[in-house]
């Protein structure tokens, strides 16, 4: 599992811009893609957060939660502003966090109140893509990072 901190050490500029884009609207909001039980993709809006240098999400009982509990694979893509259409995406696997102390620290830093119905997952950062461009520029200038060179 690759934490946000490990990703940030390996690719500091991509991580810095990625964090900026995740938090561009204040709270870290993005689109989460998961893999359904039948293998088809599913996409959902979600709040995420980088807390203690790890990427987390709290999930209520839902299709996205079931997908992550059953399969774990995910992709996360930031929202885009048409006036400044930079983009950032990561993909990897979600891991359920059972440690009560970690859950309490993450909940304290979260943008909304969570209770016991929420499942906490850490999102491993195994691949990241940053696309930078002005509103009138095409194509974007992409930078990529992967935990393995073949990705």
Predicted features by range, described:
Residues 25-28, 41-43, 116-118, 125:
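Short gly/pro-enriched beta-turn/loop segments at secondary-structure junctions
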Residues 1-13, 84-151:
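Charged, gly/pro-rich active-site loop segments
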Residues 2-30:
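Short, basic/aromatic recognition patches
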Residues 61-64, 126:
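A generic "binding-loop/recognition-motif" signal
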Residues 61-62, 71-77, 102-113:
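Short acidic (Asp/Glu) patches
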Residues 27-61, 68, 74-80, 88-90:
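Short beta-strand segments
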